[in-house]
Swiss-Prot record:
Listed GO MF terms: nucleic acid binding
Pfam families per the UniProt record, alphabetical: UPF0102
Protein name per UniProt: UPF0102 protein Synpcc7942_0312
InterPro entries reported in the protein's UniProt record: Restrct_endonuc-II-like (IPR011335), tRNA_endonuc-like_dom_sf (IPR011856), UPF0102_YraN-like (IPR003509)
């Protein structure tokens, strides 16, 4: 089992990046920054790019394990950051793209339903929900 020694938010991103690599996705960028914000992960599968927003939460949370934190305003910021990322690629920017969401939670014991698990602190981080095509740039108003 993988052991992650990073702050909670970065540990969740590292877990999802490892899961992507396990699935043979190429991780192009981690924590990519521009004036509009940060892209947690940018991966590539064949010729398509995935912009993956990772939400990591402790066992209990007010926002449905991070899902409510990705509202319309956050989606607009992610869409704009993705546009900046694509612009940085130059001529290669005409590729298929999608926005995925990965939900990671901290638990004292891993659950059988977890997609990927890693030891963290005195417990475990688990990728328990992965939402492909969670939203589109058009839906976010960009």
């Amino acid at each position: 089992m993988q052991v992650i020694d990073l702050p909670l938010d970065r540990a969740g991103e590292a877990l999802v990046a490892a899961w992507c690599r396990d699935r043979r996705l190429e991780v192009l960028a981690e924590r990519w920054h521009c004036r509009w914000g940060e892209l947690d992960l940018v991966t590539q599968e064949d010729s398509a790019l995935r912009f993956i927003e990772v939400k990591t939460r402790r066992q209990t949370g007010w926002d449905q394990s991070g899902l409510l934190a990705i509202g319309p305003a956050k989606q607009r910021c992610l869409s704009r950051a993705a546009a900046c990322y694509l612009a940085s690629l130059g001529n290669q920017a005409a590729v298929a793209c999608r926005f995925d969401v990965a939900l990671v939670r901290y638990r004292s014991e891993p659950s059988a339903a977890a997609v990927k698990v890693a030891a963290w602190g005195q417990g475990y981080l688990e990728l328990w929900c992965y939402l492909p095509d969670a939203f589109s740039a058009v839906e976010s108003g960009w």
